[in-house]
């Protein structure tokens, strides 16, 4: 128990300390970049800075606030996949204890697939509708001036969501197999990558706050590649990348394109309302686009048999739904 608990505590400690250092490096490097290139920043973000009444001395703080507002979207999806990873620990631990290699492999693949089924469409959908979603939430409020700055960050993290979303579930998988020491090491290395990237990229005026996304993505990319490798090595099982990653990504890409296309078409039809109000054609177009994207994704996954029987069973009345879908050969 101690051999599992200690690495888990260390891993959590490293993550929390890294977040503190991460915030500190972003703020300090951004402040340095602004002080050295004040005119560049005033010109680049002139509309938002003037609209918000931001003083020259507060530009760095304002830009960090814009970055922080975009993190809610990044954390929303990862919090869902985090719970999926935790819920799989008992079943996986039992399979490992019984040395049931087939069940271990099946559970690992199921965890990754379900996370991707949730994260891929949500992330790419948010990326495709980043500005409209931000406008829906912040338009007509005191925070609307951050939309032009925050939207690109939301889009970048949306595209990279599948990378961020798989990190914690893979950590849970390794912990369930009794190798909690591995995530602790990969998280530590990832933390170093993140801090170094922040120091380099955030300090570049042309990248500024957007440079923080580079460090985050490279950090988590290293963590999931390393954890995937050790997951396969420790379990002795292979990951079916076609069913777990490729199929959800294909359908999610189509889903995102449909969301974007639907909104662009509806903008020409739903032209009512004041743009500064929440109740207008543009916002309604965004909501319709999201609904269409959900339907397109679900139908697409069924057509290419992207859902597995075990995935459907976990839903309310899942067994009945799974049996019905099996009759039409719509699940893998």
For each predicted feature, which ranges?
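Membrane-interface junctions at transmembrane-helix termini in multi-pass inner-membrane proteins
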Residues: 159-189
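Interfacial transmembrane-helix starts/ends
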Residues: 2, 68, 88, 100-117, ...
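Membrane-proximal transmembrane or re-entrant/amphipathic helices at the cytosolic face
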Residues: 264-332
């Amino acid at each position: 128990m101690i051999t599992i608990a200690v690495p888990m505590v260390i891993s959590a400690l490293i993550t929390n300390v890294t977040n503190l250092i991460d915030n500190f490096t972003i703020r300090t490097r951004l402040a340095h970049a602004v002080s050295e290139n004040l005119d560049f920043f005033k010109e680049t973000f002139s509309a938002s800075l003037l609209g918000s009444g931001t003083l020259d001395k507060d530009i760095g703080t304002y830009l960090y606030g814009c970055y922080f507002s975009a993190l809610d979207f990044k954390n929303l999806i990862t919090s869902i996949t985090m719970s999926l990873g935790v819920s799989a620990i008992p079943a996986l631990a039992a399979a490992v204890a019984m040395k049931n290699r087939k069940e271990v492999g099946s559970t690992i693949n199921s965890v990754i697939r379900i996370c991707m089924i949730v994260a891929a469409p949500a992330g790419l959908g948010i990326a495709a509708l980043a500005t409209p979603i931000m406008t829906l939430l912040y338009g007509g409020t005191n925070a609307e001036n951050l939309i032009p700055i925050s939207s690109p960050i939301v889009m970048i993290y949306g595209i990279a969501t599948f990378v961020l979303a798989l990190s914690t579930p893979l950590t849970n998988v390794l912990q369930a197999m009794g190798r909690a020491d591995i995530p602790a090491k990969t998280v530590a290395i990832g933390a170093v990558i993140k801090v170094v990237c922040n120091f380099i990229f955030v300090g570049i005026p042309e990248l500024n706050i957007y440079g923080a996304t580079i460090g985050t993505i490279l950090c988590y990319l290293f963590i999931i590649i390393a954890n995937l490798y050790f997951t396969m090595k420790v379990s002795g099982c292979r990951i079916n990348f076609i069913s777990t990653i490729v199929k959800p990504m294909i359908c999610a890409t189509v889903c995102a394109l449909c969301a974007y296309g639907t909104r662009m078409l509806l903008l020409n039809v739903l032209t009512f309302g004041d743009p500064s109000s929440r109740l207008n054609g543009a916002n309604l177009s965004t909501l319709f686009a999201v609904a269409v994207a959900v339907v397109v994704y679900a139908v697409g996954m069924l057509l290419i048999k992207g859902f597995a029987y075990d995935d459907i069973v976990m839903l309310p009345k899942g067994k009945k739904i799974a049996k019905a879908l099996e009759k039409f050969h719509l699940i893998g």
